[in-house]
């Protein structure tokens, strides 16, 4: 971070139209993978006034009630009345999901599971830094926490005039690679028409902003932009069309690290867009947790139908205790980054994905979940269980 003095990241709430789409896509994936863990799923969603459309390609033996899944996601988010502009109980649901191409299947599937080829070509990045306790960049971490708190305040009734759609943005000031202050906070939240701007600003400042941002990072010149346009009554899919995969920077590192371009939601773990990005985070986080570097960005690339990565590269931005080449060797010795090996290493064949589809895929806490008879750990890529082995192998 030493190359920046200011850095800004944004996040959006679970009620943002693009995030509604992401959550629907991942809810469909979860429902299918709960019945058929080896299913191939690529589900895209579009939401707009009064309608949700799901499309994509699936190869599975499972049957799931897709319309019911879509409606439940929308209702659970809080779009349950025409008063808020969208109602999961009455909106139209269109399903145009088809079968996966046999050409893709023959390139991916193998008689030996460990030889499974990548589902597509592409490049993926993983990143970690020691500037927060979750080893994530501070601007995106604070941005996620603001919209998470907005949802908590809305759902608990703490601020009952809040509605589901919201966006946040945080600008952090850095000195010598460390966060020393927050220079600007933007929080725009949908609300009902009866609340005054004065009450809205006071409630958001006291019960959301000050609850999230550490007081020692705020200063006399910190800018607070709370609903800067004044009113935000019309929101959600009425205000904007929502699509799966349009918040890839929100989903990852808030722009602090590079991005290969592939979205996550709606894709089963055979798609390296998702699984290899999770593996990249796992590798980078363990490198930083081991004390091998203060910051680490790793790139992995694949060819469709080929198991072994076509490249692995790494950058510690001058913060490494070892050379980057030596750390890459440690990565190759300690992590198998073939697609099937990633799925096994991170235990990805479980219905865990809807939980990832809002408030970021990274910087989360591994949590035990139970779906039906299946008990598993979600967010396994956030574990630091390889740090000790890496530290020992590095001789630190």
Swiss-Prot record:
Q: Which residues bind L-methionine?
A: 57, 100, 240, 271
Q: Where does Mg(2+) bind?
A: 18
* Superkingdom in the source lineage: Bacteria
Q: Where does K(+) bind?
A: 44
> Which cofactors does this gene product need?
Mg(2+); K(+)
A single GO CC term for this protein reads:
cytoplasm
One of the entry's Gene Ontology molecular-function terms is: ATP binding
Q: What class of enzyme is it?
A: transferase
Pfam family name, one: S-AdoMet_synt_M
Q: Region Flexible loop: start and end of each range? A: 100-110
Chain sites annotated for binding ATP: 16, 165-167, 240, 246-247, 263, 267
Matching InterPro entries, A to Z?
Answer: ADOMET_SYNTHASE_CS, S-AdoMet_synt_C, S-AdoMet_synt_central, S-AdoMet_synt_N, S-AdoMet_synthetase, S-AdoMet_synthetase_sfam
Tell me the protein family, please.
Belongs to the AdoMet synthase family.
Q: How does it assemble?
A: Homotetramer; dimer of dimers.
Recorded hits in PANTHER family, A to Z, give: S-ADENOSYLMETHIONINE SYNTHETASE
What HAMAP family does the entry give? S_AdoMet_synth1
Q: What is this protein called?
A: S-adenosylmethionine synthase
């Amino acid at each position: 971070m030493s190359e920046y003095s200011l850095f800004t990241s944004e996040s959006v709430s679970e009620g943002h139209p693009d995030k509604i789409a992401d959550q629907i896509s991942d809810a469909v994936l979860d429902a299918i993978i709960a019945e058929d863990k080896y299913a191939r799923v690529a589900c895209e969603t579009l939401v707009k006034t009064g309608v949700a459309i799901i499309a994509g390609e699936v190869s599975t033996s499972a049957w799931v009630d897709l319309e019911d899944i879509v409606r439940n996601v929308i209702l659970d988010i809080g779009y349950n009345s025409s008063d808020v502009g969208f109602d999961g109980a009455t909106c139209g649901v269109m399903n145009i999901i088809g079968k996966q191409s046999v050409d893709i299947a023959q390139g991916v599937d193998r008689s030996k599971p460990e030889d499974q080829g990548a589902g597509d070509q592409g490049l993926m990045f993983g990143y970690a830094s020691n500037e927060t306790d979750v080893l994530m960049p501070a601007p995106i971490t604070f941005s996620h926490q603001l919209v998470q708190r907005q949802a908590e305040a809305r759902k608990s009734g703490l601020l009952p005039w809040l509605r589901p759609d919201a966006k946040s943005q945080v600008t952090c000031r850095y000195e010598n690679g460390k966060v020393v202050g927050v220079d600007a906070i933007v929080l725009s939240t949908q609300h009902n028409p009866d609340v005054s701007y004065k009450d809205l600003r006071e409630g958001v400042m006291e019960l959301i902003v000050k609850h999230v941002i550490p007081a020692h990072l705020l200063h006399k010149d910190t800018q607070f932009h709370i609903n800067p346009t004044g009113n935000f009554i019309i929101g959600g899919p009425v205000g904007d069309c929502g699509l799966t995969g349009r918040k890839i920077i929100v989903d990852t590192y808030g722009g602090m690290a590079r991005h290969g371009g592939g979205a996550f939601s709606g894709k089963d773990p055979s798609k390296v867009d998702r699984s290899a990005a999770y593996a990249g985070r796992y590798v980078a986080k363990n490198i930083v947790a081991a004390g091998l570097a203060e910051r680490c960005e790793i790139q992995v690339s694949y060819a469709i139908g080929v198991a072994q990565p076509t490249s692995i590269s790494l950058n510690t931005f001058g913060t490494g205790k070892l050379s980057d080449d030596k750390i890459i060797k440690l990565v190759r010795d300690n992590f198998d980054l073939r697609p099937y090996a990633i799925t096994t290493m991170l235990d990805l064949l479980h219905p865990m994905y809807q939980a990832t589809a809002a408030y970021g895929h990274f910087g989360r806490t591994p949590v035990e979940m139970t779906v039906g008879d299946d008990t598993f750990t979600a967010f396994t890529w956030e574990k630091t269980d390889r740090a000790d082995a890496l530290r020992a192998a590095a001789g630190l």
